[in-house]
Amino acid sequence: MRSRILAVGAVIALLTVACGNAGSDKNGSVPQTTKPGTPPITEVTGADLKKNVPLSGVQGVTDDEIKVAVITAGSNPLAGDYTTYKDGIQAYFNMINEQGGIYGRKLVISSDRNDGFVNNQQTVKTSLAQDHAFATFIASPLFYGANDIANSKPQMPTFIWNINQEFAGKPNIFGNVGALCFSCTGQGLPYLAKSQGFTKVAVLAYGSPAASKNCAAGAKAGFEKYPSAQVVYFDDNMRLGQPDLSAQVSAMKDKGVQLITTCVDQAETLILAKELAKQHLDAVQNLPNSYDPKFAADNAQYFEGSFVAPQFASFEYKPLLPTQEQFIEWMGKLNKRVFEIPAYGWINALQLVHGLKLAGPEFSQQKLIDSLNQDTAFDAEGMIPPIDWTRQHNDPAGPNGTTNTEVSGKYICASTVTIHDGKFVPLDDVPEGKQFICMTGGANSPTLTETPEYMRFGPS
């Protein structure tokens, strides 16, 4: 049941948020463009954004509202409250609604459902049958309802926090990143080890589910292809929720491990961190899905020097983008915390509105889907590396751990930070004004990046 969050730990935790070719625009300014060969499409602006055209037969739309449904894993045994995804959506909607909405209509969350972690498919089916929303937002480790979304009639525009392999191949489902590669061999961990001077690495994973073992195998393969450090300890047979890691830590201490990459959940990383402290092993972790200031502060003594990389520009890299400042402001107005999961809600709410602006005042669900699928550089106003929706709905996995660059993204970037005194701090090597560390040489580069490109995708 924990498979998605485990797999994504390997895919996105360090410099592997997108499979593809590293970009060459060092300024990072990427205009939104249109699929070659199609009529140009641009966002509606000015007075047209206020134009209220009566729409007949468009599901979830009235003369004064655009209704959306939200599905999250509220009853979630993994660390992190997925219901906070809705907070980011609501914050963005509040900002747009205060400006008068779009096309004379307010954006409204009309349904909020908890899929109970294991009931995603049934919850999706119920929402599709009963909520009659214009669009759906989903954040759940298990996306078993993906095929129901893909086969919905009318096609349901759906926006997810993408940590799910079920995302791939469904053109009406959009995410904060494109389709992820769950088997590609990446430069991320080897580059991290090299840049930080680590030479001895450990990899930990559960024996079941298979995704955890695959994650560990991918991490190990990365160091075999790019041998910046040696994997001196490897255990992919841990038990789910294993409470005692004393044997593993003792073995790692004997091997002189400096960096630990894990394919386990957040709760397990804390168990590991406490055991590291108990045995006085001065090793740091690569932490998946842990960009949460409260988690870092509450466990400051255990995670000093560990690394975290959200799927967006970390707020520690200044100056902040205008949309980052807006996110902080409008989350504050909701009296909600600023951290990783709500930020994905904000990004995807922005993407919905972007799609509406592309579709125009006479919008429909299908027009919104078609419009977004012409966008070759959606970057959420700079918060994420640009997504090419003409390519990145497709699974980028190639044979033998390679990436199919015909359908992968252009950039291999992450916005990695480290934990110091219970706070996230930027890496020293990143120049002021840049927010992302990007690999060079392409997704299938035969050699490890020597000098990365430091990029910023939004305005300075």
Model-identified regions with their sequence ranges:
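N-terminal export and membrane-targeting signals
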Residues: 1-11
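Bacterial lipoprotein signal-peptidase II cleavage site
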Residues: 19-29
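Extracytoplasmic "Venus flytrap"
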Residues: 43-65, 69-90, 112-118, 206-215, ...
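Extracytoplasmic ligand/sensor domains, especially the bilobed periplasmic-binding protein
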Residues: 53, 133-235, 284-308
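Beta-alpha junction/loop-to-helix N-cap segments that form part of ligand/metal-binding clefts
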Residues: 54, 80-87, 98-171, 236-246, ...
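Extracellular/periplasmic periplasmic-binding protein-like sensory domains
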Residues: 178-180, 275-346, 358, 450-458
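Segments of small-molecule ligand-sensing domains
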Residues: 333-342, 354-428, 433
